[in-house]
């Protein structure tokens, strides 16, 4: 079965795995892990890494060149709408008018849970200014629909807390978000290992964004390769359609044509 491409806003992609750039030991490991992941979209925390705003520091774009990858600036570290909006404006300036961004407005330092009120405020302003918004949000289906209705091009509910590795804690609500959405739904945050990524895709999600699950692994490049395979396997399983769950056994061997009677 031929799969359709992942379409986000005005762009389309073959890979459904999106990766971050934080927590690697150096730029070489970052480069190798991203290559092993097969990702086409690479997200960058504008407030934390250098993509040209500091001429005297190593530039991350030397290992993720914009001509090879779609750079997805994100607003990690922003705790109010105003700082998130300013960060997106800076990203557009540094990336020569690039308007696809990942919006995340955090509620507190301990949970890094999304502040929905400030997220909605920032999203409205940025969309009015021509940005294409991929938005980090809770797994609340009502909030997800509101963000879609205002014009966000992708909804990104958390699987569990950022960097926790706890996996997909509320698969039912994420399934509801996906069933109700007319834009891509990508799990963002909480993935810890390959099985978590596969589960997200089996739920019908359009993709998964991850960073710590790869960067904090004992062997990040190998984990990146595992995640690539998990995304592909989970997607194929979803397209294939799983067997129905049953309460009782159902023998797989035929019940007719026995040699012995």
From Swiss-Prot:
One of its GO terms (molecular function) is thiazole synthase activity. It comes from Acinetobacter baylyi (strain ATCC 33305 / BD413 / ADP1). Homotetramer. Forms heterodimers with either ThiH or ThiS. InterPro entries: Aldolase_TIM (IPR013785), Thiazole_synthase_ThiG (IPR033983), ThiG (IPR008867). Keywords: Cytoplasm, Schiff base, Thiamine biosynthesis, Transferase. 1-deoxy-D-xylulose 5-phosphate binds at residues 163, 189-190, 211-212. This is Thiazole synthase. Its EC number is 2.8.1.10. Catalyzes the rearrangement of 1-deoxy-D-xylulose 5-phosphate (DXP) to produce the thiazole phosphate moiety of thiamine. Sulfur is provided by the thiocarboxylate moiety of the carrier protein ThiS. In vitro, sulfur can be provided by H(2)S. Pathway: Cofactor biosynthesis; thiamine diphosphate biosynthesis. It catalyses: [ThiS sulfur-carrier protein]-C-terminal-Gly-aminoethanethioate + 2-iminoacetate + 1-deoxy-D-xylulose 5-phosphate = [ThiS sulfur-carrier protein]-C-terminal Gly-Gly + 2-[(2R,5Z)-2-carboxy-4-methylthiazol-5(2H)-ylidene]ethyl phosphate + 2 H2O + H(+). It is found in: Cytoplasm. It holds the Pfam family ThiG. Coiled coil: none annotated. SUPFAM superfamilies: ThiG-like. Belongs to the ThiG family. The active site is at 102 (schiff-base intermediate with dxp). GO terms for cellular component: cytoplasm. GO terms for biological process: thiamine diphosphate biosynthetic process. HAMAP family: ThiG.
């Amino acid at each position: 079965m031929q799969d359709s491409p992942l379409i986000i806003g005005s762009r389309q992609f073959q890979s459904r795995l999106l990766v971050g750039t934080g927590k690697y030991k150096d730029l070489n490991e970052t480069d190798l892990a991203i290559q092993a992941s097969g990702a086409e979209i690479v997200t960058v925390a504008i407030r934390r890494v250098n993509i040209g705003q500091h001429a005297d520091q190593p530039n991350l774009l030397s290992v993720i060149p914009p001509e090879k990858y779609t750079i997805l600036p994100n607003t990690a570290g922003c705790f109010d709408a105003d700082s998130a909006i300013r960060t997106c404006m800076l990203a557009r300036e540094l990336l020569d008018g690039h308007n696809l961004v990942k919006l995340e407005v955090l509620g507190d330092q301990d949970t890094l849970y999304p502040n929905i009120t400030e997220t909605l405020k920032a999203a409205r302003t940025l969309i009015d200014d021509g940005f294409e918004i991929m938005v980090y949000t809770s797994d609340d289906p009502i909030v997800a629909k509101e963000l879609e209705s205002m014009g966000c091009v992708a909804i990104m509910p958390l699987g569990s807390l950022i960097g926790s590795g706890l996996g997909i804690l509320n698969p039912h609500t994420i399934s509801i978000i996906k069933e109700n959405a007319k834009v891509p739904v990508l799990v963002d945050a909480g993935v810890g290992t390959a099985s978590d990524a596969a589960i997200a895709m089996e739920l019908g999600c359009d993709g998964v964004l991850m960073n710590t699950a790869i960067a904090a692994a004992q062997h990040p490049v190998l984990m990146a390769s595992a995640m690539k395979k998990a995304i592909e396997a989970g997607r194929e399983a979803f397209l294939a359609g799983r067997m129905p769950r049953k309460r009782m056994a159902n023998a797989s061997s035929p019940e007719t044509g026995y040699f012995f009677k």
